[in-house]
Amino acid sequence: MTAVGSGTGLAATFATEVRTRLDRIATLAADGGLDEAITLLTEAIEAGAVIQAFGTGHSEAFAMEIAGRAGGLIPTTKIALRDLVLRGGYEVDTLGGSTMERNPNVAEDLWSVSTINPGDVFVIASNSGVNGSIVGMALLAKQHGHPVIAVTSLQHTRAVEPKHPSGQRLCDVADVVIDNLAPYGDATLALRQAHDAALTGGVPVGSVSSITSAFIAQLLTIGIAERIAATGAVPPLYLSANIPGGDEHNSGLERRYEGRIRRGT
């Protein structure tokens, strides 16, 4: 972490931390799994399959960047823990806190209420890469013959113990691993204050995994669209629903994937 004091320089320092990571992700695309993931996902879409995006906690934001948004690909589905409440008979209270995302046993139930077909590819995001539901879903996908792409912090996941009974991390299960370059603990800045004697390294602030993971999601989408367009085909992309003709455009393309994609909450 970068140690900083309070003041107006915090924004500039954080911007530097973010920019440095985004530049590295873009520069290392070929060696960091991004190009391999784009190839895998493009081939799946061209074969009529769907991208299954999954994340828990703040990593659900990654799945939201992949599935069902303006400028995003239409053959995508977001899997979320709340699906167990909406379709699996779980009580609403079970969503509180982090108990559910750490529970490896929910993966089977979540799989049973999801729309998954042969050939679909899973893209699973988890900064820590060790929670039970995340690793459990990755293992289930592999058991059913689906490729798995992981978006995770390699620095963080290698520094913590796995929580899944298998002893595996998300990066151990995945076919392709993309490092979101977040540091251990996610925060990039250590804010020094006179009253924080108990926190000798400073107060951790300025988390970056959501930003870098969203960037990765967009690079994946752009790369897939570019590959499809290069063949002369029109990439199946959403328009904003809040522009004239957006709903009609989107509905028409969604009908091609009827029964294979699901737009949830």
PLM regions: where:
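Flexible, glycine/charged-enriched surface loops at secondary-structure junctions
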Residues: A30-A37, I51, A229-Y238
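A short, well-structured juxtamembrane/interface segment
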Residues: A26-E46
